[in-house]
UniProtKB/Swiss-Prot annotation:
Statement: the UniProt record of this protein carries the keyword RNA-binding: yes
Zinc finger (Matrin-type): 55-85, 117-141, 180-210, 230-257
Localization annotation: Nucleus; Cytoplasm
Lineage of producing organism: Eukaryota, Metazoa, Chordata, Craniata, Vertebrata
GO cellular component, one term: nucleus
Residues binding Zn(2+) 2: C119, C122, H135, H141
Function description: Binds preferentially to dsRNA, but also to RNA-DNA hybrids.
The encoding gene: znf346
Segments for region (Disordered): 151-177, 250-283
Protein name: Zinc finger protein 346
Keywords attached to this entry: Cytoplasm, Metal-binding, Nucleus, Repeat, RNA-binding, Zinc, Zinc-finger
InterPro entries: Matrin/U1-like-C_Znf_C2H2 (IPR003604), ZN346_ZMAT4 (IPR051868), Znf_C2H2_sf (IPR036236), Znf_C2H2_type (IPR013087)
Amino acid sequence: MERLVQRMYCLGMRDPPPANIMAQQEPNGDFPYLPSGAAEVNRMIKENSDLFSDSQCKVCSAVLISESQKLAHYQSKKHASKVRRYMSIHGSEEPIAKRFKPSGDDQSNVDEKDKYKACSVCNMTFSSPVVAQSHYQGKVHSKNLRMQSIGSQTPALPQPEAQAKKDDGMQGPAEQDPNRFCSICQASFNNPLMAQQHYSGKKHKKHMNKQKLMETFGPSTAPASTVKGYPCTVCNIELNSVEQYQAHISGSKHKNHAKPKKGPNAFAPPPDNYQPDYQYPTNEDCLEDPAEWDSFNVAYE
């Protein structure tokens, strides 16, 4: 270094050499300096392990995935510039190890900084806060976060007594809550979000339409365990959808089966309250005065 200074003075330069030149020429001096070669890079990492490692540079928020990338990063001018800026802001009077050991009051701030370096939910690391912010606002993080919350709310196994009540047909408090159980589809939910997704889905709407049709046209005579579609007991067939069922009951084939049969065995006696369209009058109705009816009988004899 003395030779460099003497040479610069010989060239007429009265001012001291620039700081970056001193940094490059003094690898054994004060930090920061720009290392040259793998040995100096490893030495710098070892002496400043709180800031640098073989896989990460905390000053630049850079993740290093290979040996060549590590050497290229730590020997770059961009890295040296950020280190000088970091040291000018934080100062060098306080030991590095002490600066990076958070106290109890600063633990929340450290956690806030750590979330911009890695995401424990998605098991990812970030090279900068901008990349981290983009990840936290993305669909992948939202999906993994939702799946983690669902997994943490997994219900416990039912007790034997509760299971016996369920087998007897008695509904518990959870089965009476629509956010926990759908009595129409016999489906249970872990949280209100799953319930909302179920109620807006096609399967639930299909069962709702089926229930309305059964209430309108009457229940099926077939066992409930074998009924998977929309049965017509008149024609003894089963339809797959609401549209097919409505088209069937509006068709001529169904109406022909629904009409009363004609033939010798098709006659049925009238009901007790049957009233004919025309009633024949009696004798009393024809002759209002009974004396007139007696005179009519004498004249006839």
